[in-house]
Amino acid sequence: MVEPREQFFQDLLSAVDKQMDTVKNDIKDIMKEKTSFMASFENFIERYDTMEKNIQDLQNKYEEMAINLAAVMTDTKIQLGAIIAQLEILMINGTPLPAKKTTIKEATPLPSSNTNNEQSMSTYSSSISGKTSETVKKNPTNAMFFTRSEWASSKEFREKFLTPEIQAILDEQFANKTGIERLHAEGLYMWRTQFSDEQKKMVKEMMKK
């Protein structure tokens, strides 16, 4: 017969063993959860790195596109300014001459009254040929073939090919603009306010050719 004291210790040891088994099982479950969590976390890190790389690639592409777009817009604005300058000259002087490369010094000045394009003038007497004066048409539309920089910045160009009245209007309307931006704004203003329907039709027909 087992004594009460021995029975007590046996029961206590049995209870401790059961509790230890429970703790061991809990530890195993925790380790499994830890392993699963670490796998998920590593997968998350890989996905984050991939996402970060994709974002960086997109940012690089965006910056490259922004640079290309700025270059295209600048070139387009310059070309549009050149077209607007031609429209201004066309409105003031009528149908242009055949294309001819010239400079501002070679261009014929605009008549001060701007009445019509058929006004004549006497040519100078040639010291070589000895020709006498003859009547010729004054057609200053050679200015259409200036370089873009001359269109955008030449004060002499404005004085020669725009009447004082038009210059005054444009100076008042666009005093806060300069360069190509001002040329663009002036051209649009003149197209909308100064061109007749007939002139607009003629310009549109020319642009189709």
Curated annotation (Swiss-Prot):
Induction: Expressed in the early phase of the viral replicative cycle. It is found in: Host cytoplasm. It comes from the Viruses. Residues 110-119 have a biased composition (Polar residues). Its main location: host cell. The keyword Protease does not apply. Residues 107-135 are annotated as: Disordered. Induces host endoplasmic reticulum stress and consequently activates autophagy and NF-kappa-B signaling pathway. In turn, may induce autophagy-mediated STING1 degradation and innate immune evasion. Belongs to the asfivirus K205R family. This is Uncharacterized protein K205R. It comes from African swine fever virus (isolate Tick/Malawi/Lil 20-1/1983).
